[in-house]
Amino acid sequence: MTHPYKTREGGATVTIFVPYDCRNHCPFCVNKQEYAHAEGFSVEAILKSIAVMDEITPRCDFVFTGGEPFANLKALQRMLDAIPTTHKVYINTTFPVQPGCSAEEMIAFTERNRDKITCINISRHLTKYVEESPDEVVARIATPKRVNCVLYMDYPADELVDYAERWRKYNIPVQFRYDYTETTPENLYQEEGDKILADLKKRFTYKGLDGCRMRNGYHFDYKGLHMTYHKTLPYSTIVETGDDGVTYDI
């Protein structure tokens, strides 16, 4: 950063890319190329970074992503144990079917760490890109949980209601996501021409909008199930001049 740092109360969200890859090849993933050259990735380096960020912003949020955080439970446990309880912790995962680690082991991990994990976000898309663990397994995750669904390119809009019913059965909230590689400051809040927003408003009850300059959320209800349509910029910093005349990295 070249300017003074400014962020929301509590500090910026810190994203931790776990130092091991996943077995997936989702077409909208922008992280896969980073794991092709992961020589500098290590649990030890991440532990040092966690300590640094805790000192700078002792109440910031941590988000584990990848890669696949649940591909190495021993390493994930070490990283979780290093985060003080002043922070909220989120995990993005496919909760995968994977060799060497059963669904029961992953469920037990969530039970042991239910006091450390704020929410687990499980990827389940309209189009299947990976071998998914059964919905009944997802429902057994011991922490608060949410399903993330990227509505990518020519997604099957006529399946949206069935998808909502699928998760209403377990009362698991749903977050539909725009392809964030296509999000810009100009279209972040642009509603005209937003096909996803139109498809959702056509099928579900629109409840309102919240957000900031970096991201937003359109909220919907379907028979008591809370759903969100989320858009976010593909980068974490914007440069802006404040009312005091000082230029900040935000």
Q: What are the functions of these language-model segments?
A:
Residues G11, C26, T86, I117, ...:
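Short, well-ordered alpha-helix to beta-strand connector turns
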Residues K48-I56:
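A short, N-terminal amphipathic alpha-helix
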Residues R23, E55-I56, R114, R168-K169:
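Alpha-helix termination/capping residues and helix-transition junctions
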Residues T13, N31-E44, T57-N72, T85-A103, ...:
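Core AdoMet radical
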Residues K32, T228-I250:
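Flexible mid-to-C-terminal extensions adjoining Fe-S/redox cofactors in radical SAM and related proteins
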Residues M1-A45:
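Canonical Radical SAM [4Fe-4S] cluster-binding loop centered on the CxxxCxxC motif
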Residues K74-D81, P99-R112, E131-V137, D158-A164:
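Distinct, well-ordered alpha-helical segments
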Residues H125-S236:
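Radical SAM enzyme [4Fe-4S]-AdoMet core and its adjacent flexible, acidic
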